Each structure stands twice: as C-alpha cells, then as structure tokens.
Amino acid sequence: MATRHQARTAVVGLLYAYDLGNENIAKFSDEILEEDKIRNKQRDFSHDLFDGTIENLEMLDAEIEKHLTDWDYDAIGRVEKAILRLGAYEILVAKTDRAIIINEAVELAKSLADEKSPQFINGVLDAIGK
C-alpha cells in the first residue's frame, strides 16, 4: 500500500502537469495514480489534495506570492511551485499540522527539485503557516 508521502509525490506530478497547461490531467489522474500503485484510501487522499489545490489555486498563489522575499513569483520553478501550492493548501485549507506539512514539502523538494529548493520551500511555508 502506498504511503501518504508517495501520494503527495504523485500529486506534485499532477500539479506540475497542470501548470504546464495540461488542464485535463484530472481526467487521467486515476491511471497515473494506478501506475504509481496509489490505491484505495491513498488514491482518495490524492484526489482530495489535487482537487482542493486546483479549486483554491488563485488564493494559494496569492498567499505564496505574499510571503516571498527577494523572489519573483514567476521565476519560481514549476516543481517548486507545485510543492509550495500543495503545502500551502494543506496548511491553509486542509488544516493539516504545519510541522508535518513543512517536513513533507522539504522531503519532496529534496527528491524532486534542486539543492537550494528545500531551504526556500521551508522558509515560504513556515511564513505561510504563521
């Protein structure tokens, strides 16, 4: 059975594809999640995260942008943006424990983004969570 971390990793991939302009990615999400062996409760968890993030995208982007220091929002990489959006959604909307989400986001950044991303993502999500 997939873990929540694996489910979040898949959601980052879906958000990344969405950001690239594939707005129909939701139609294929079951197949994508199945490829990653994300099933049952974790699949439902993934759908909730993806759908909730997309539904709140404008507000999440505004919150992220508000907490950037010395960064232009448009200059943030797409992977980093996907991780920030997911983390902001879980902190602000899903009300998941802030420390857990920041840790998850940092771990996602370590495995999916460049070496400077974990610290950047930690700082932004920490500011959002306060």
UniProtKB/Swiss-Prot annotation:
- Cystine pairs annotated here are none
**Residues passing through the membrane, by range:** none
Q: What Pfam families does the entry give?
A: NusB
What are the recorded Gene Ontology BP terms? DNA-templated transcription termination; transcription antitermination
Keyword Transcription regulation on this protein? yes
MF (Gene Ontology): RNA binding
- Keywords carried by this UniProt record: RNA-binding, Transcription, Transcription antitermination, Transcription regulation
A GO cellular component annotation here is: cytosol
Record keyword Transcription present: yes
InterPro entries the UniProt entry points to: NusB-like_sf (IPR035926), NusB_fam (IPR011605), NusB_RsmB_TIM44 (IPR006027)
Which NCBIfam families does the annotation name?
nusB (TIGR01951)
Tell me the PANTHER family matching this sequence: ANTITERMINATION NUSB DOMAIN-CONTAINING PROTEIN, N UTILIZATION SUBSTANCE PROTEIN B-RELATED
Q: Which family does it belong to?
A: Belongs to the NusB family.
The entry's function note states: Involved in transcription antitermination. Required for transcription of ribosomal RNA (rRNA) genes. Binds specifically to the boxA antiterminator sequence of the ribosomal RNA (rrn) operons.
- What name goes with this protein? Transcription antitermination protein NusB
The organism is Sulfurovum sp. (strain NBC37-1)
Q: Gene name?
A: nusB
